[in-house]
């Protein structure tokens, strides 16, 4: 999915692969890819779990928690001379992360405007954002109202919801949106 998004945004994707949960193999793969890439993007392995190989293998990168949902765990830095972005493994979290971090990076590298188009549209259904996190909800616009593309506005594993997504609805921390 991330490779397809990057391609749609004008990047030449050099490789897209699954790497075993081995720190040595993962780091060697990153070293090989970094020699032929300007940007290295990973998905999965960036939180605090026992099998977070990305975090273990690239301990010189920054891994942090961002006050956002979905996509709270993130990684970034420079691996060799290559920009590194480490996204969560949940598909919706990865999609949101790519929209917020990879797309502007690629646009900046191409010399294009990095601003997202922002419009205010009434909510077409009710939802609450979590306390202390900005929520980015994959959504669609129907009859002038924004509606989440999945039934529960928050399931980062609901990849099928992305097929209908045409926008990201943004609700700042602790916002209660009511349908109009």
Q: Could you say what each language-model-derived stretch is?
A:
Residues 1-42:
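Phosphate-binding glycine-rich loops and their immediate beta-loop-alpha structural context
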Residues 42-54:
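Glycine-rich beta-strand-to-loop/alpha-helix junction loops that act as flexible
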Residues 23-24, 48, 95:
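Loop/helix-junction capping segments adjacent to catalytic residues or to phosphate/diphosphate-binding pockets
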Residues 18-21, 45-46, 66-73:
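Short, ordered loop/turn segments at secondary-structure junctions
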Residues 26-28, 52-55:
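Short acidic, glycine/serine/threonine-rich loops at helix termini
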Residues 57-178:
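Flexible glycine/proline-rich
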Residues 1-8, 136, 176-180:
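Short intrinsically disordered, low-complexity coil segments enriched in acidic
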């Amino acid at each position: 999915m991330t490779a397809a998004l990057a391609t749609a945004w004008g990047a030449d994707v050099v490789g897209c692969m699954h790497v075993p949960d081995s720190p040595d193999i993962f780091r060697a793969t990153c070293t090989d890819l970094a020699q032929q890439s300007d940007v290295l993007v990973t998905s999965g392995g960036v939180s605090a779990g026992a099998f977070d190989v990305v975090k273990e293998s690239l301990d010189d990168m920054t891994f942090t928690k961002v006050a956002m949902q979905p996509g709270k765990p993130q990684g970034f830095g420079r691996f060799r001379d290559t920009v590194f972005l480490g996204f969560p493994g949940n598909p919706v979290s990865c999609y949101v992360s790519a929209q917020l971090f990879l797309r502007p990076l690629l646009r900046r590298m191409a010399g294009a405007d990095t601003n997202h188009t922002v419009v205010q549209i009434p909510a077409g259904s009710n939802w609450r954002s979590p306390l202390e996190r900005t929520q980015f909800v994959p959504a669609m616009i129907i009859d002038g109202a924004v509606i989440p593309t999945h039934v529960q506005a928050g399931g980062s594993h609901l990849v099928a919801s992305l097929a209908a997504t045409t926008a990201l609805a943004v609700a700042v921390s602790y916002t209660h949106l009511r349908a109009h």
